[in-house]
């Protein structure tokens, strides 16, 4: 069930089209974790992914989201005071930790398992040009449970605005996901 794909880690960057393909199960093969698609995919491209480097020497992911005033969340959060919901930036970091596991070749259904600490010190407004996510992989556990831990930072136009410590994402056997409870 948690077999490693033979073609894992063959690329160091990914386009929006490739990320959408990941969400449809066409990028890393059958059984690989999927990204959300369409509006819930909070990433336009992965500019760097590596199993080496980063603050802990276990890997790094850099990805970007292009910002424009027409993005869906600016229309409803909040009327007259548009701002990207902070939870979407947090979700983007979880998406990228799961993507890292799939890129490494691990299989299973991806689920966010939590975060140790999150700090918001800024915001993403419609006038911004770009958001960058930087994830430093702390550890990958590959036993019965496949799990990655990472620290992440969200930048808007080059300025750090969110930090997250101990982001956790796990990959699960589909049979263990039959109800509301994760087994």
Curated annotation (Swiss-Prot):
Protein's GO biological process: unsaturated fatty acid biosynthetic process
Nucleotide-binding in keyword set: no
Record: active site: 77
Keywords recorded for this protein, A-Z: Cytoplasm, Fatty acid biosynthesis, Fatty acid metabolism, Isomerase, Lipid biosynthesis, Lipid metabolism, Lyase
Catalytic activity: a (3R)-hydroxyacyl-[ACP] = a (2E)-enoyl-[ACP] + H2O; (3R)-hydroxydecanoyl-[ACP] = (2E)-decenoyl-[ACP] + H2O; (2E)-decenoyl-[ACP] = (3Z)-decenoyl-[ACP]
Cellular component GO terms held in the UniProt record: cytoplasm
InterPro entries to which the protein is assigned, alphabetical: FabA, FabA_FabZ, HotDog_dom_sf
Pfam families cross-referenced by the UniProt entry: FabA
Location(s) in or outside the cell: Cytoplasm
Superkingdom of origin: Bacteria
Main localisation: cytoplasm
GO molecular function: (3R)-hydroxyacyl-[acyl-carrier-protein] dehydratase activity; trans-2-decenoyl-acyl-carrier-protein isomerase activity
Residues passing through the membrane, by range: none
Protein's UniProt keywords contain Lipid biosynthesis: yes
Pathway entry: Lipid metabolism; fatty acid biosynthesis
EC annotation from Swiss-Prot or TrEMBL: 4.2.1.59, 5.3.3.14
NCBIfam families cross-referenced by the UniProt entry: fabA, PRK05174.1
Its biological purpose: Necessary for the introduction of cis unsaturation into fatty acids. Catalyzes the dehydration of (3R)-3-hydroxydecanoyl-ACP to E-(2)-decenoyl-ACP and then its isomerization to Z-(3)-decenoyl-ACP. Can catalyze the dehydratase reaction for beta-hydroxyacyl-ACPs with saturated chain lengths up to 16:0, being most active on intermediate chain length.
Family statement drawn from the similarity comment of this UniProt entry: Belongs to the thioester dehydratase family. FabA subfamily.
PANTHER family reported in the protein's UniProt record: 3-HYDROXYACYL-[ACYL-CARRIER-PROTEIN] DEHYDRATASE, 3-HYDROXYDECANOYL-[ACYL-CARRIER-PROTEIN] DEHYDRATASE
Subunit structure: Homodimer.
Name recorded for this polypeptide: 3-hydroxydecanoyl-[acyl-carrier-protein] dehydratase
Encoding gene per record: fabA
């Amino acid at each position: 069930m948690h077999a490693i794909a033979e073609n894992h880690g063959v690329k160091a960057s990914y386009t929006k089209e490739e990320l959408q393909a990941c969400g449809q199960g066409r990028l890393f093969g059958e059984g690989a974790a999927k990204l959300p698609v369409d509006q819930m995919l909070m990433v336009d491209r992965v500019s760097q992914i590596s199993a080496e480097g980063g603050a802990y020497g276990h890997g790094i992911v850099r990805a970007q989201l292009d910002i424009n005033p027409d993005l869906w969340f600016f229309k409803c959060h909040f009327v007259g005071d548009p701002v990207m919901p902070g939870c979407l930036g947090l979700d983007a970091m979880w998406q990228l930790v799961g993507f890292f596991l799939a890129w490494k070749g691990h299989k299973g259904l991806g689920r966010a398992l939590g975060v140790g600490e999150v700090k918001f010190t800024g915001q993403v407004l419609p006038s911004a040009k770009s958001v960058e996510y930087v994830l430093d992989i702390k550890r990958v556990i590959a036993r019965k449970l496949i799990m990655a831990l990472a620290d992440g930072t969200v930048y808007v136009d080059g300025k750090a605005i969110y930090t997250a410590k101990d982001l956790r994402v796990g990959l699960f056997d589909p049979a263990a996901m039959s109800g509301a409870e994760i087994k």
